[in-house]
Amino acid sequence: MNKKTLMVCGLIGLSLSLQAQTKNGGIDKQMMQKIVAGHSSASNRALSNAIATNSIDNLARNFRKAGGLDTHFSVETTKQNIHDQKSSGRCWLFSGMNVLRSNFARMHKDTLHVEFSHVYLSFHDQLEKSNLMLQGVIDNAKKPMNDPIVQFFFKNPITDGGTFCGVADLVDKYGLVPMEAMPESYSAENTSRMASIISSKLREYGLELRKMVANKKSAAAIKARKTEMLGDIYNILVLSLGEPVKTFQYAFKDKNGNNVGKPQTYTPETFRDAVLGKKLNGSFIMAMNDPRREYYKTYEVEYDRHTYDGHNWKYINLPMEDIAKMAIASLKDDTKMYSSYDVGKQLDLKRGYLDLDNFDYATLFGTKFPMNKAERISTF
């Protein structure tokens, strides 16, 4: 049997397979009749007209939640300026900086305030994540392209999201600088295009590194080429975010914004030591509520970190009741508690308010959404 015969046989087999799939699993006419039955009522037509010309959220908004919000809190922490992450995924970094500057104000009995540069750590975060991706590709280069770990690196080479573990690793490694020393840039506040460009380069570089491993290039040659690649990424970051400062002059300020003492010369490392007085790693724990897994045990997510030589996302799994007690105790101690949520669900953007009953999508569409938290996490 020649190649042409094999190809014809293959096409016939594929055709028969597709016919079988359509017959058994496709939407046939009889099924379509059942699907569309009962959807032409007057009430459905009215809803269709409304939904076609209005925002789904506006129509599903729960009017019972439209009253004024009670902004009184029985326990409050030291007040600070509010910072806006704009169109970026750096909520983890902004929250982490909020905790650090709150701790600084508390250490000085609210007599001194400081504002940290977000873009300084964002720069190093993106460079470190680029190295994490490239080194991860090297480490797994002998695995096929369809291996889950290899796909993990190539599918999302870099993001600007993260956890407090990333804050700790970056601050401990690169220090801190005040906002005045390195202000936000356009690409820091609008990260999507820069991330897309860097991701494209990382995919290109990842394939090249896999070829180098396949061609049995030496470890030294591979490391040298990776270093050149990171130099290109560094250049993109410098042009987009600005070059990280090495030294700067700074005078601390009181809560009214007035300088306290004369400006002094700092490096990012000496400034970090001045405001924190200690390394962050080893000074905190991460708690998580994941009802899929056994409580009161510690879990670690491999490669879910910001730096190759840093710490994975590691957490103790606790019931929400325990986490709530920890949060209250932290607030009573005037210590802000870093926390993260899936704010894409039931968030009223206009009011800045999260509530499970903000929007009633089930009633609007005549259906139910019965999945519990464990099921939602398992299937996202």
Residue ranges and their predicted role:
Residues 22-81:
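N-terminal regions that are enriched for targeting/export leaders
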